[in-house]
């Protein structure tokens, strides 16, 4: 065979292969049926996946910590760490593998990283993916992921593995895939980063459905239009070339504006952070405030017939995705790397500024300290404006979904939810500080030396006195 797939299958090996090394024998048997250049595609949970440390139950048995404790109470199903799996590959005939890491897991992957393209700091921030069982919430996974990434430990603690296995080392071109398919079919795409034989990386946006091809091809036109608009602020646009139904873009290197701001925040340089952030807010205003804003039918179709101020300004073309995560800073230039959500009709510049602030300030808890600096107010955005922009953003997200029902929107209806352990801990800690203090009278009125304290246990105290 050219390909053999083992998707959520390999872990059951010891249930039906009766041998001393069932998982090794499993791969030995399967690999005999491959062509010389054939591949095994294997997807499986990582026994040491971070989600299990954070309070998700083991996928097959539904119990807490079963896998990370080495399956002390169960038999018949086993998952493996990366080190353990490498040992199995070697014993099974020195098989070679290309390693990929689906996130949040291989069942509902939204991104797939690899050793050649690991996640960036702050990229892994999904919380609501336990659709089948109740989970504990022991810590903020996003912040722990950042710690693992900075210590080169992510491959050991990724939630799932996707392996391309062969008798020779597989040469797999994609190094990263992001799925944007929780959308209306006409907008459903995926983004792929591939590596050529010479090591050069390229980015490609591909329609997931045939009727999304027009959406992808339109990126070529948008690129040309934005290039002229952004030139006045010395901002470059990631070059786009349309090839068939795909959009091919440059792979740009550097640091995102988001990461730059985060570094300043971590160093306590908040004044410098604010100055840098607002320099880009001013660029947006300079580019997008060319004429008074008036609603168009196209605007209402996407953002709704909202009640906007009369003094807003705009341009004919509006890139609402000009947010810090999409701006790359390199030594000698500033570039916009993603401009998919550019509309060829006017959108108020203030909404673009609102999105810049919101998508930086509100999506990471560590940035909460910046809220006291009143970025919205300093940008001229009033509380009543925010209410309207929240409605616009909601309508925009509904436009993207169309008739599609996203899994994330069904979480509240499907999932048993989560138990917030920190809240429980704080509650119990507060109880531990609540004490009953009893004084006895030695003729000195209230005297701390003549007293005893008792801790409440489950809201009660029981004690005895010898009289």
Predicted features and spans:
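A short glycine-rich, Lys/Arg-flanked "PGG" loop and its adjoining helix->strand segment in the class I
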Residues: 19-39
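Conserved class I S-adenosyl-L-methionine
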Residues: 41-64
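Catalytic activation segment of kinase domains across protein kinase-like and atypical kinase folds
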Residues: 61-72, 299-368
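Rossmann-like AdoMet/SAM-dependent catalytic core
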Residues: 84, 98-193
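ATP-binding glycine-rich loop module of kinase domains
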Residues: 178-225, 260
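Conserved structural core of kinase catalytic domains
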Residues: 236-303
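C-lobe/activation-segment region of protein kinase-like
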Residues: 335-425
């Amino acid at each position: 065979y050219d390909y053999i797939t083992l998707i959520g299958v390999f872990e059951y090996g010891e249930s039906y292969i009766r041998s001393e090394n069932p998982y090794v024998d499993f791969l030995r048997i399967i690999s005999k049926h491959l062509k010389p250049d054939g591949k095994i595609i294997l997807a499986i949970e990582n026994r040491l996946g971070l989600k299990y440390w954070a309070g998700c139950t083991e996928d097959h048995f539904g119990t807490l910590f079963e896998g990370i404790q080495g399956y002390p109470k169960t038999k018949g199903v086993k998952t493996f760490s990366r080190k353990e799996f490498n040992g199995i590959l070697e014993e099974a005939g020195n098989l070679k593998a290309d390693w990929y890491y689906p996130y949040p897991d291989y069942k509902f992957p939204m991104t797939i990283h690899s050793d050649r393209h690991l996640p960036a700091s702050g990229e892994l921030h999904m919380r609501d993916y336990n659709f089948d069982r109740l989970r504990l919430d022991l810590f903020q996974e996003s912040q722990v992921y950042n710690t693992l990434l900075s210590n080169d430990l992510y491959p050991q603690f990724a939630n799932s593995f996707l392996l391309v296995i062969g008798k020779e080392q597989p040469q797999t071109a994609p190094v990263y895939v992001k799925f944007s398919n929780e959308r209306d079919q006409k907008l459903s795409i995926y983004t792929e980063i591939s590596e050529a034989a010479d090591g050069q990386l390229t980015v490609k946006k591909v329609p997931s459905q045939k009727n999304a091809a027009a959406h992808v091809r339109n990126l070529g036109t948008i690129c040309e239009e934005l290039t002229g608009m952004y030139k006045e602020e010395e901002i470059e646009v990631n070059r786009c070339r349309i090839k068939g139904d795909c959009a091919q873009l440059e792979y740009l290197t550097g640091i995102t504006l988001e990461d730059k701001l985060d570094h300043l925040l971590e160093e306590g340089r908040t004044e410098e952070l604010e100055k840098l952030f607002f320099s880009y807010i001013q660029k947006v205003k300079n580019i997008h405030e060319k004429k008074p804003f008036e609603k168009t039918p196209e605007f209402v179709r996407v953002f709704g017939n909202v009640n906007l101020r009369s003094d807003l300004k705009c341009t004919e073309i509006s890139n609402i995705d000009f947010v810090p995560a999409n701006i790359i800073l390199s030594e000698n230039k500033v570039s916009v790397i993603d401009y998919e959500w550019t509309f060829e009709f006017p959108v108020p510049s203030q909404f673009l500024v609102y999105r810049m602030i919101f998508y930086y300030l509100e999506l990471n808890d560590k940035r909460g300290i910046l809220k006291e600096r009143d970025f919205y107010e300093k940008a001229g955005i009033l509380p009543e404006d925010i209410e309207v922009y929240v409605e616009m953003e909601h309508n925009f997200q509904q436009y993207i979904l169309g008739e599609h029902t996203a899994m994330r929107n069904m979480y509240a209806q499907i999932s048993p939810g989560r138990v917030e352990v920190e809240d429980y801990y704080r509650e119990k800690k507060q109880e531990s500080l609540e004490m009953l203090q009893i004084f006895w009278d030695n003729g000195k009125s209230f005297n701390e030396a003549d007293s005893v304290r008792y801790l409440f246990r489950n809201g009660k105290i029981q004690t005895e006195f010898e009289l």
